[in-house]
């Protein structure tokens, strides 16, 4: 009589207990395996505890189908609160093509962020590192706050604050590939205390409707409205491309609205925003007011950019995504650092020659009578004290940048041998020479 097959709960393991505990391969020879026979010990096969996949319950599927049938008469667009946003996301996905690497569900869940799908060409450019180097969210509250991209005019007392035109009023094109669709960032502006860069914009925008309320800009500042409109269009396009690059880097997730996301949520998905920080810095450094020939940057603007460079450098080293592995990022940061040191060296030269470039450098509500004075509230520094404070401040800022360049040189040794690595080494040595010459000039 044939023996029936054992039940599921009575089946034995394939390997004996001794081989299983010793993590050795068992030849599964029952009743005694080869290893247990050689060692002359009992070979025990325990009952297998593994169970199969639990059976499916078709009743739940039927319940879901019935629930879908009850709500089938409703419009899916009007029934959901985010229907209008899903239509907009569909439009963005259709515009960018089939190369987007995130779905419509991801776009609907992050409705507050900037959702921009990127094409495979941008993805390849980011991986190769041809145009942009790297992407960290600044810890500086000035950069993170909305005031960094808001416009606050410096009007005389008693006048109402003006309102800056939106990007859509400056850029007439509203096509699917226009910068307006690519980016939801407002036109980049400086805070109110850096209002000297906005005098030309104020005169150009308000010159059509009413007499402008600010002083005439210098000759080095562009004053025509067409030139200003071109500058804003270029900046808006740059911001749109930066949004697309962040979408590729972070798998379609835009820049978070809450500051310090990486520090507050260390276990969340890794996101890199170093390119956003570098883009903001480059847009300031390449501002037409700062890059004119035969003109020097304002001292307060140089100090502001020095703080931004130091913050970006610190955040890039702490970034868990890029970890300062990109030579393009080091080159971009080295160029911006070189510009800041050039501006500080100009201040040192002016101090050594008996002049200064402190026009308008003040912190307070009441402007000083002398435009070359430093005012803190109602307290105005005299010439000797002002020169001493300026020398100490410039010397401190220059010495603070020395360890930055030393670290750049150490990071550059990992990619030694290439043309870009050699260029970074040359730039770092040149910046070191500029710092030493400026410090020696101030000591003399």
From Swiss-Prot:
Start and end residues of each stretch annotated as Disordered: 49-88
UniProt keyword Transit peptide present: no
Keywords assigned: DNA-binding, Metal-binding, Nucleus, Transcription, Transcription regulation, Zinc
A GO CC term assigned to this protein in UniProt: nucleus
PROSITE patterns given in the database record: ZN2_CY6_FUNGAL_1 (PS00463), ZN2_CY6_FUNGAL_2 (PS50048)
InterPro entries linked: OAF3, Zn2-C6_fun-type_DNA-bd_sf, Zn2Cys6_DnaBD
Localisation: Nucleus
Residues of the DNA-binding region: 16-43
Stretches with biased composition (Basic residues): 50-59
GO molecular function, one term: zinc ion binding
Biased composition (Polar residues): 76-88
First-listed, main subcellular location of the protein, grouped into a coarse class: nucleus
Note: Gene clusters encoding host-selective toxins (HSTs) are localized on conditionally dispensable chromosomes (CDCs), also called supernumerary chromosomes, where they are present in multiple copies. The CDCs are not essential for saprophytic growth but controls host-selective pathogenicity.
Main function: Transcription factor that regulates the expression of the gene clusters that mediate the biosynthesis of the host-selective toxins (HSTs) AF-toxins responsible for Alternaria black spot of strawberry disease by the strawberry pathotype. On cellular level, AF-toxins affect plasma membrane of susceptible cells and cause a sudden increase in loss of K(+) after a few minutes of toxin treatment.
Name used for this protein in its record: Transcription activator AFTR-2
Organism: Alternaria alternata
